[in-house]
Amino acid sequence: MTVLIAKDLTFEPVVHRYDWTVDEVRELLERPLMDLLWQAQLVHRTANPGYRVQLASLLSVKTGGCQEDCAYCPQSMHNSSDVEGQPDLVVQIQTVLERARAAKDAGADRFCMGWAWREIRDGAQFEAMLAMVSGVRELGLEACVTAGMLTEKQASRLADAGLTAYNHNLDTSPEYYDQIITTRTYQERIETLQKVRSAGITLCCGGIIGMGESTLDRASLLCVLANINPHPESVPINGLVAVEGTPLQDLPAVDPLEMVRMVATARILMPRSRVRLSAGREQLGREAQILCLQAGADSIFYGDSLLTTSNPDVKTDRELLSQAGVHANWEESDE
């Protein structure tokens, strides 16, 4: 299928590209909003017909005490906001699978599990992770894990357990990265993505806006993502949730239209990736969320909490999707 991209209000057939320049991406990102939305709509309708939205539920399995110094994160041991809790491993497995079953019953397609780690380490906790992945897959759900860096062998074992996707965000541009994180390099993130893909696991990789970065930084982040070949299977677009006790606690909320622009540009650059409207969605309001769905978002986190921040409840999201006229799995689950 040919993907159509509009330029100066004319149609121009374009195949998937992996050689974008930052200047090209910035030009897209800064287009007049109506033109940008129109172009994103053309790509979205062509590449992703049916207006179906994937519902992903997210659970924090291991919370707090992370060695990384990510400036936005309340789970970092470097920040005064650090929260921590580690249930017994046996109870943990049972509880996670119960939560996954409840998420499926509510209409979720994918169950995502998060561990606040710098890296995965072999041992009982990794074995528990593998059991959780297998259990989630047996329920008929896609399984996604986010747990920091990993080895090739660990990636292979996760693939054998049935893992659908591994989340490892780039967070921001290579140029701005050191302003946000100093305990892990950008190159280490890229290498983690390569190990995941080599194991046959799909990539979930995106970033965060609203951390003090420039428009050029946002364009640079999107450029890196769009030049991954093939494109990441899913691309979460997050708006900063400024949490007290983190270095970014005093930053203002993201302008909702800036989120719309990021979603629209991501859709144009990566036509068949799932563009996931992620953290910060509560701050957007109904109208901006609907604009994001129009611009190309075809996945949301579903449920009243993310890792450590709040999220719209299920009833609110069902109403939103119905008002927007998009379809999701919960419609079939209620029949």
Curated annotation (Swiss-Prot):
Biological classification of the source: Bacteria, Bacillati, Cyanobacteriota, Cyanophyceae, Synechococcales
Keyword tags: 2Fe-2S, 4Fe-4S, Biotin biosynthesis, Iron, Iron-sulfur, Metal-binding, S-adenosyl-L-methionine, Transferase
GO terms of biological process kind: biotin biosynthetic process
PROSITE patterns assigned to the protein according to its UniProt record, in alphabetical order: RADICAL_SAM
Physiological role: Catalyzes the conversion of dethiobiotin (DTB) to biotin by the insertion of a sulfur atom into dethiobiotin via a radical-based mechanism.
Name the UniProt record assigns to this protein: Biotin synthase
SMART domains: BATS, Elp3
InterPro entries assigned to the protein according to its UniProt record, in alphabetical order: Aldolase_TIM (IPR013785), BATS_dom (IPR010722), Biotin_synth/BioAB (IPR002684), Biotin_synthase (IPR024177), Elp3/MiaA/NifB-like_rSAM (IPR006638), rSAM (IPR007197)
Native species: Prochlorococcus marinus (strain MIT 9303)
Database matches in PANTHER family: BIOTIN SYNTHASE, BIOTIN SYNTHASE, MITOCHONDRIAL
Residue positions binding [2Fe-2S] cluster: C112, C144, C204, R276
UniProt-listed NCBIfam families: bioB
Gene3D superfamilies, per database record: Aldolase class I
